[in-house]
Amino acid sequence: MTTIVSVRRKGQVVVGGDGQVSLGNTVMKGNARKVRRLYNGKVLAGFAGGTADAFTLFELFERKLEMHQGHLLKSAVELAKDWRTDRALRKLEAMLIVADEKESLIITGIGDVVQPEEDQILAIGSGGNYALSAARALVENTELSAHEIVEKSLRIAGDICVFTNTNFTIEELPN
């Protein structure tokens, strides 16, 4: 699988992910870009799960963003509705973290939209719990930037989770 983590701190939101693509217990690729900018660079999105499924969801989510003039929550809820009701979409196995300058969300593989706890930290994927724990400890006990926290959290997850590597893609808003 993978690890995707998002941290919002001091006016910045950062989403980062590793680059490993696995098929069963075999590493197929080590430098996949699982974090991307959508909607003219105003929205960050990262995926965990099946790569082809995630690209389908990226496309669908970007269409929803266009349809709803970039309104993140409305677009996420509309995608989740489609995900639940469309037979083909229901078979997709992926999760997304999406974020803009105002809010961050997880869109789950069963069509739920989840807002973060008060700490504004989100993580998904096989190494998600490791990255989430590390990010929470770093936010609470350091003055590191959101970018530094995401990078350190991914590194910790990559050291523990065999389905996460240390080849990261990290995007942030504002630039």
UniProtKB/Swiss-Prot annotation:
GO terms for cellular component: HslUV protease complex; proteasome core complex. Its main location: cytoplasm. It catalyses: ATP-dependent cleavage of peptide bonds with broad specificity. One of its GO terms (biological process) is proteolysis involved in protein catabolic process. The active site is at T2. Allosterically activated by HslU binding. One of its GO terms (molecular function) is metal ion binding. It is found in: Cytoplasm. The keyword Transport does not apply. Pfam families: Proteasome. Belongs to the peptidase T1B family. HslV subfamily. A double ring-shaped homohexamer of HslV is capped on each side by a ring-shaped HslU homohexamer. The assembly of the HslU/HslV complex is dependent on binding of ATP. This is ATP-dependent protease subunit HslV. The lineage of its organism: Bacteria, Pseudomonadati, Pseudomonadota, Gammaproteobacteria, Pasteurellales.
